[in-house]
Swiss-Prot record:
Protein name, entry field: Transcriptional regulator MraZ
GO BP term, example: negative regulation of DNA-templated transcription initiation
Gene label: mraZ
Species of the source: Azotobacter vinelandii (strain DJ / ATCC BAA-1303)
Entry-linked Pfam families: MraZ
Localization annotation: Cytoplasm, Nucleoid
Subunit relationships: Forms oligomers.
Length: 152
C-alpha cells in the first residue's frame, strides 16, 4: 500500500526518481511496470502498478458502452494511459503531454493513495490540500455516513 506525500523533482527530461521506500514493493508487485494517466477529476496524474491498472481496465471494459459517460471516461483514462518502467536507478519518464495536463515543473508531489499514486504540481497540491482541510473543518456534518463512521 502506498501512503504519504513525497516531494519529488523532475529533471530536464521529465524524469522522476521513485522514492526508495516504494521501489521494493513496486518491483515485487509489478516488476517496476507502471501505468500513468490523467486524473479525470483533478489536475494531476495517476500512477498505477500494472496489476492495479489491469483491474481498472477490466472494470472499464464491463461498463455499458452505449452510454456517453462511459465512452468519455474510457477516452480520458485509457486514451491517455502510458506504460512506464522504473529504470535501474528507480526513475521513470513522464511524457510531455501528461506533464502539461498536470502543470508539472521541477517541483512536484507524489501522493500515495493506497493502490496508486497521484502526481501533482507542488503548488496545486498545497492549494488542494489546504482547501480540502478547510472544507472538512467547515462542514464536518456533510460527510457521507460511511466516512463519518470511519474510525481515525
Amino acid at each position: 500500500m502506498f501512503r504519504g506525500a513525497n516531494a519529488v523533482s523532475l529533471d530536464a527530461k521529465g524524469r522522476i526518481s521513485m522514492p526508495a521506500r516504494y521501489r521494493e514493493e513496486l518491483m515485487a508487485r509489478s516488476a517496476g511496470q507502471l501505468i500513468v494517466t490523467i486524473d479525470a477529476m483533478d489536475p494531476c496524474l495517476c500512477i498505477y502498478p500494472l496489476p492495479e491498472w489491469e483491474l481498472i481496465e477490466t472494470k472499464l471494459r464491463e461498463l455499458p458502452s452505449l452510454r456517453e459517460e462511459t465512452r468519455r471516461l474510457q477516452r480520458l483514462l485509457i486514451g491517455n494511459a502510458v506504460d512506464l518502467e522504473l529504470d535501474g536507478s528507480g526513475r521513470f519518464l513522464i511524457p510531455p503531454r501528461l506533464r502539461e495536463h498536470a502543470s508539472l515543473d521541477k517541483h512536484a508531489m507524489l501522493v500515495g493513495q493506497l493502490n496508486k499514486f497521484q502526481l501533482w504540481n507542488e503548488d496545486a497540491w498545497i492549494a488542494i490540500a489546504n482547501a480540502d482541510l478547510a472544507a472538512i473543518k467547515q462542514q464536518p456534518g456533510d460527510l457521507p455516513g460511511e466516512l463519518r463512521d470511519l474510525i481515525l
